[in-house]
Design a protein with these regions (language model features):
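Short, cationic-aromatic polyanion-contact patches
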Residues: 1-9, 24, 54-63
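Short amphipathic alpha-helical interface segments
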Residues: 5-34
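Alpha-helix boundary/capping detector
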Residues: 16, 39-43, 54-55
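Short amphipathic alpha-helical interaction segments
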Residues: 33-47
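Glycine-centered, phosphate/nucleic-acid-interacting loop/turn motifs that mediate DNA/RNA or nucleotide
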Residues: 50
Length: 63
């Protein structure tokens, strides 16, 4: 049985996208209050883990 482990900030982003459906990186930045450089890394990691996908260039949603 394989479990995916997420950091607190990754969980926060997943929760935001679960509630809102789709958000731009600017909206995620404002709502999460995570620093921009850290948010970019979190979004990349979540994409690599297959949890989120980018949409329309700057948007993100759950996979």
């Amino acid at each position: 049985l394989s479990q995916k482990l997420f950091t607190l900030n990754e969980t926060s982003i997943i929760s935001l996208l679960h509630r809102e459906g789709q958000l731009s990186s600017n909206e995620l930045l404002q709502r999460s209050e995570i620093p921009q450089d850290e948010l970019a890394l979190i979004l990349l990691n979540l994409e690599l883990k297959g949890m989120i996908k980018s949409t329309n260039g700057d948007g993100y949603m759950l996979s």
